[in-house]
Swiss-Prot record:
Name of the protein: Tryptophan synthase alpha chain
Family classification: Belongs to the TrpA family.
Lineage of origin: Bacteria, Pseudomonadati, Pseudomonadota, Alphaproteobacteria, Hyphomicrobiales
Originating organism: Rhodopseudomonas palustris (strain TIE-1)
Pfam families with a match to the protein in the record: Trp_syntA
SUBUNIT field: Tetramer of two alpha and two beta chains.
Length: 278
């Protein structure tokens, strides 16, 4: 199967440049604004969009993304409504890859088969589920592949040579390398260490490797993207969104623009990086 993710990375490889992968939380700060933000991202320079599925117990997320999830839940965002956002986005954009990112519990409650069918029909391309290790591939990873969705795995600095083949075995789309240990948004990534780690992963897979956690500025995005096939930015976008809200936490006229402007500057940084050697 060839997904939008595969097509996008193949196109970027031909262009000789890395991807900018952006993360936003579905329904933050409300569903209407969230849809406007999603629609603004590709024009601002996002190549792939990760959409967070709000969850009440997001253990791998730092304070910014946790707060975004709480805002989304408060606004009434559910997994069904998240899929509705994807459907609405697809009405005007059939090319930009969309990846749902989050935890297994809401999917389990929704029902795996129903979720996969609805996600595929809505226009989802891939999943990143942070709390399902390879040992549990039968739960969701293998059914997702059968449904035509990429299942994207996280690798970390502590994923050793012995563990990597298991992590990569059923991975598709791209590999998401978490450049620092800990929670999202908590430190900055070191470009030279990232480069060595990406090369280590590439000895085990032909998939693109994208690097996330700790990228907040165009310069950092450029430095990291130069070492990989893409840079993932999340917490910095959530912070920009939050800074644009009013005292009650509601969207203002500047909310969509605040996120889009930061994405445009990050995209310029990433586009200034040459594609890492394959």
């Amino acid at each position: 199967m060839t997904t939008r993710i595969d097509t996008r990375f193949a196109d970027l490889k031909q262009q000789g440049r890395p991807a900018l992968v952006t993360f936003v939380m579905a329904g933050d700060p409300d569903l209407d604004t969230s849809l406007q933000i999603l629609k603004a991202l590709p024009a601002a320079g996002a190549d792939v969009i990760e959409i967070g599925m709000p969850f009440t117990d997001p253990m791998a997320d730092g304070p910014a993304i946790q707060a975004a999830g709480l805002r989304a839940l408060k606004a009434g965002t559910t997994l069904k409504k998240t899929l509705g956002l994807v459907r609405d986005f697809r009405a005007t954009d059939n090319a930009t890859p969309l990846v749902l990112m989050g935890y297994y519990n809401p999917i389990y409650i929704y029902g795996v088969d129903a979720f996969l069918a609805d996600a595929k029909a809505a226009g989802v391309d891939g999943l990143i589920i942070v709390d399902l290790p390879p040992e549990e591939d039968e739960e969701l990873c293998l059914p997702a592949m059968k449904a035509g969705l990429n299942f994207i795995r996280l690798a970390t600095p502590t994923t050793d040579e012995k563990r990597l083949p298991a992590v990569l075995a059923n991975t598709s789309g791209f590999v998401y390398y978490v450049s620092i240990t800990g929670i999202t948004g908590s430190a900055s990534a070191d470009a030279s260490a990232v480069g060595a780690a990406v090369q280590r992963i590439k000895r085990h897979t032909n998939l693109p490797v994208c690097v996330g956690f700790g990228i907040r500025t165009p310069d950092a995005a450029q430095a990291i993207a130069a070492q990989a096939n893409g840079a993932v930015v999340g917490s910095a976008l959530i912070d920009a969104l939050k800074a644009s809200l009013d005292a009650e936490g509601r969207a203002t006229k500047g909310t969509v623009g605040a996120v889009a402007d930061l994405v445009a500057s990050l995209a310029a940084g990433v586009r200034g990086a040459k594609q890492a050697a394959e």
